[in-house]
Amino acid sequence: MYPAHLLVLLAVCVSLLGASTIPPLPLNLVQFTYLIQCANKGSRASYHYADYGCYCGAGGSGTPVDELDRCCKVHDDCYGEAEKMGCYPKLTMYNYYCGTEGPYCNTKTDCQRYVCACDLQAAKCFARSPYNNKNYNIDTSKRCK
């Protein structure tokens, strides 16, 4: 085998090892985004909830800063319960519809029903909770203890 071939083989192996540590993207995030838009009738873009308070977005700790942040904590806890049931909430795809009364779930499996219910509950909670711009992109190391 030529030295160049060995280098290519080594590069491929290293790439595969590195890729195995990259977490999968949350596939149902797009669905959750649409549920949010349906529930709030497009009044606020979904990305506004991605970095809000102590719990809206990746991770979460401390005491929620307000009602909207509590919605995110409840959603995180709901996903935690789904995981205890053996579900993968961030990867679970489900069927939902946006009707005149807002979003609703129409799914088949237990995991799909549970995860869709988590997302639906959060989307409706977001829609009825006041949004405080001061709680967007806060310093979580100081405010979320």
UniProtKB/Swiss-Prot annotation:
Binds 1 Ca(2+) ion. The active site is at residues 75, 119. Disulfide bonds join 38-98, 54-144, 56-72, 71-125, 78-118, 87-111, 105-116. Its main location: secreted. Residues 1-21 form the signal peptide. One of its GO terms (cellular component) is extracellular region. It comes from the Eukaryota. Its cofactor is Ca(2+). GO terms for biological process: arachidonate secretion; lipid catabolic process; phospholipid metabolic process. Gene3D superfamilies: Phospholipase A2 domain. Expressed by the venom gland. Belongs to the phospholipase A2 family. Group I subfamily. D49 sub-subfamily. This is Basic phospholipase A2 cPt09. It comes from Laticauda semifasciata (Black-banded sea krait).
